[in-house]
């Protein structure tokens, strides 16, 4: 109910749709149940004009050099780490470059197929992560942004 009211008021809701952690080399399947929960909340609260914004966060450099697969586990938030422990580890140690990429916004209605929506978002996130990890250009639109 709280999520629906928040969306109906025009506010953002942040969902980490993977629901689990990885070292940043792969994108795990996005949980379509989270899209379903958002749709249910939308219907209950009468929220309209809801948009899903696919986002990718990639640690691309360590001490100015590209991050290797082995080094990703030193940066990633993996399983049993607390938020506090993870933030402390990221902020300590070597300098890290982080890239945040925004994909194509996806309008969401209560009638959309949650599995199709989550798969489309997952494909965008995966394509952006692969491009960032390889040092390539982001796929898609001209307005695709990096921070």
Language-model-derived ranges and their functions:
Residues 103-107, 112, 116-118, 126-138, ...:
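Membrane-proximal, solvent-exposed terminal domains/tails of membrane-associated proteins
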Residues 1-8:
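Membrane-interfacial amphipathic helices and adjacent loop/beta segments
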Residues 11-17:
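Generic beta-sheet signal
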Residues 2, 33, 37, 116, ...:
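Long, highly charged amphipathic alpha-helices
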Residues 9-10, 94:
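Structured helix-beta-strand junction loops
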């Amino acid at each position: 109910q709280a999520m629906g009211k928040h969306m109906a008021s025009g506010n953002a809701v942040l969902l980490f749709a993977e629901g689990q952690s990885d070292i940043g080399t792969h994108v795990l399947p996005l949980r379509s149940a989270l899209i379903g929960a958002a749709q249910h909340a939308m219907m209950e609260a009468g929220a309209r004009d809801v948009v899903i914004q696919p986002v990718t966060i990639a640690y691309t450099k360590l001490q100015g050099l590209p991050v290797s697969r082995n080094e990703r586990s030193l940066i990633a938030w993996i399983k049993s780490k607390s938020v506090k422990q993870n933030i402390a580890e990221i902020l300590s140690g070597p300098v890290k470059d982080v890239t945040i990429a925004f994909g194509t916004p996806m309008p969401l209605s209560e009638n959309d197929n949650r599995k199709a929506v989550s798969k489309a978002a997952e494909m965008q996130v995966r394509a952006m992560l692969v491009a960032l990890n390889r040092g390539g250009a982001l796929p898609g639109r001209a307005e695709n942004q990096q921070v």
